[in-house]
Amino acid sequence: MKASKYILPTEKENPADAVVASHRLMIRAGLVRKSSAGLYFYLPLGLKVLKKIEQIVREEMNSTGALEFDLPILTPSDFWEQSGRWSAMGKEMFRIQDRHDLSYALGPTHEESFSFLLKPLLKSYKDLPVNVYQIQTKFRDEIRPRFGVIRSREFIMKDAYSFHIDDSSLDDTYQAMRVAYRKIFDRCGLKTIPVQADSGSMGGSASEEFMVVSPIGEETLLLCNSCGYSSNSEKTPLILKKENSSAKFSEKKEISTPGKKTISEVSTLLGVSESETIKAVALKSEKKKILVFLRGDLELNLHKLHSLLKIADSEPMTDLEIRELGLIPGFISPIAPNDKIKVLYDRSLQKDFPYVVGSSKEDFHTQGFILEKEISGLPEFADVALAREGDLCPNCSFPLKAEKGIEVGHIFKLGDKYTKAFGIQVLDQNGKSKTLTMGCYGIGVNRTMATVIEQCNDEKGIFWPISIAPFEVSLVSIVKGEDQYFKIEEFYNVLMNEGIEVFWDDRDLGPGFKLKDSELIGFPIRITIGKKFFESGEISIYNRKKDQEDSFVFSGFDDLVARVESMRQELFTELR
């Protein structure tokens, strides 16, 4: 490809609204342009990268025996009603009505559609297992799109769904997908960590996210450097260090705390640590009022709570709603007032420790409150607090380390949530009807592209892994007159005929501008031919990742091709 025939709108300045490297560089390198909040146009260079990632995904999926489909983006509301997710998906799902007042969703995911499609196609255990997938545009009405294409409202996703006669078969495919995902991300040049994750509205018994450690990540990962345990903090069980702490207040007594409603305010006033207090969190879901008590220095983990109570979402109660339940905001006692509210106690709490708690009385707290003495029939405590760095590994009790991460892939064991909802049954080996079990496997293609840039950039721009670079080789020519131009064209044609992807910058621009553009865009290999070649036969070849340039005297096209192929193979080998 010749740059003179290409749309190549590179920019020197960073866009004002881009706060992360991938967003800045995708704009500056001419890969994308913004349409509106969370929506992007893909330009030719950016589209080439996307298509290469898609092809890697397709090759690895096909190698496992998965079958590619293409389903409608519009999905009827009936499908979602049948699974119970029309309301559970919340406001993130785009919903539209046609001229006949029929409701549809712009598909954010396709469990329902594939279940509907596969039900009449699967008759017997002999048809199983089957793994089906598509690579398609998805939609989510993100309330705050950010970080360019990392969190956008429209995105390309590979979503796969497997159907099985039993859990053993599901586990085989789950593990095969786990291996395939590592291969996909390795081939894309991404270093990923599989971590245990919460299944959320997807449902199911188990899931793992493929995370890329990055300071801009929106997820918190908890990693064990001793045994290799890794988990999203949303999923990590909380195991606290054992501390020989003695309470400041052992005698039970009501104390005045005027206007002090927060844990920080109360602990400061009384001179106690926040871990000696009990925090009350009042929430409401669609059908429940919820009151959670946990140690004052900890935060509630909503994902654990929702999973435990089998609810889709919750939100804080207002002060008025709290008072209507007979409670005093900021001064709530751990003693449940009535059966109108679901009460949970986090397992961070010690039953025999004298805590500072609310008194159910305006401007008063109680010191020396011991749960097992004050609450009759104390229920089993639940794990609903958020684990943090320094808490203990659930496998080996080594302190956990926290890292921020970007999710690029997610695999789920869905169980029979959708197959039951859609009545997907086959005849087993004994001729009896059996409900199938499912798996689900997703990869964000655009997000993978952006995350590669987050890992592969420097002060000059992007340095693409050669497997997904828009072009493998940049040929920069610095010529005067047609004779020199035609000589360089001979180099271009030879490389192209050897099957090497070449982007020839033949624009009538200064050498500095061309060289900076090639480094900004991030072509893995650059060949520069200019004045020195026409004087002494000297050519330079540049490795963008290493930022290393070597010069040699041209001795023939075979030698040049061999040098390029050697560098290509070196760059591909680094991805393995």
Curated annotation (Swiss-Prot):
GO terms for molecular function: aminoacyl-tRNA deacylase activity; ATP binding; proline-tRNA ligase activity. It catalyses: tRNA(Pro) + L-proline + ATP = L-prolyl-tRNA(Pro) + AMP + diphosphate. GO terms for cellular component: cytosol. It is found in: Cytoplasm. Coiled coil: none annotated. One of its GO terms (biological process) is prolyl-tRNA aminoacylation. Consists of three domains: the N-terminal catalytic domain, the editing domain and the C-terminal anticodon-binding domain. Homodimer. This is Proline--tRNA ligase. It comes from Leptospira interrogans serogroup Icterohaemorrhagiae serovar Lai (strain 56601). The gene is proS.
